[in-house]
């Protein structure tokens, strides 16, 4: 009721953000789940499927081309619809064209063509996400509204993930895989229509855009200006980066190591698919909604601290599951805890990232912070894998909990006087 009430008071654009988030989440799972699953059905080996996932690398490198989105104006589209909406429409139209590649071609037919199409889809989808992130920061007119914008975007993204995984599987069983890709194109086609229905945001600072392609000097100048502006606004920038790294530990390590643990404990594929994927995503949506609401009630800093502390329950529950062994009830409690924490803390940390950005180059700033967060997730997952090889599961997740608690020390070092 709280969210519905907020929409009704001249905030209808939040519904647009939710729907655009749904498209983004659906595309994300198309790349990371749907196509790999179809390849698994076709008996492709795990090493091939693993290499295919590299086609999604543009998601980790958004910062590389975000300066172009901040500085360059696409002829006609940006002058007609505004900078953010123009870029959004361009990226969505390119995304639709890329997806049509799977209409006359099955991903199982040629692995090299599949990788190429997925890479193009990833690039277009990542570009769309850069623009939407900037829109969610620039469009709101208050801190509370900013929290709502990221909450609605997060809920939409999770719904899209649910539709792109469980929904895609059901459609493939009832019809076929080609119908799944037709549905994907239809859903993505809604993107430009939604963008046309929402207003162009007012930049937080004066923007100096150009219709000429920026040169290498201008490109690095945008990145340099973004970092300098970020450093000027945030005196303890290095400590903030360390805080983000430690904050992700309670989320990234259990997420990366949960599948090996569950298989070691002899949970079935059906149990993992239904409880971990379908039910887990639903709980994630609930957690994300509550996280967004909390940030509007008690402020972003207190919400970040609360989310981080609650997040510590995730590795603790996996430790208990490792001690107990195969137990469906404990498994459900563990997955409920983990996914609630991911949704709850994930939404709050996204709002926190948005609050750090305040310059002419918002898309670049947010991409820098989000890219660091993504790299942190990858590094933590890799370190977790190495440690898990030498430690029993219960001790591993206990150490994970202790390590994750270090974020509290860094948080109070940076924000102790502001709480």
From Swiss-Prot:
Gene3D superfamilies the UniProt entry points to: MFS general substrate transporter like domains
State the membrane topology: Multi-pass membrane protein
Q: What is its main location?
A: membrane
Output the Gene Ontology cellular-component terms: plasma membrane
Q: Name one GO molecular function term.
A: transmembrane transporter activity
Going by the UniProt record, its keywords in alphabetical order are:
Cell inner membrane, Cell membrane, Membrane, Transmembrane, Transmembrane helix, Transport
Which residues are listed as membrane-spanning?
12-32, 48-68, 86-106, 111-131, 155-175, 178-198, 237-257, 274-294, 304-324, 330-350, 368-388, 392-412
Record's subcellular location: Cell inner membrane
The entry sums up its family as follows:
Belongs to the major facilitator superfamily.
* Protein name per Swiss-Prot or TrEMBL: Putative transporter AmpG 3
Origin organism lineage:
Bacteria, Pseudomonadati, Pseudomonadota, Alphaproteobacteria, Rickettsiales
What gene does the UniProt entry assign to this protein? Answer: ampG3
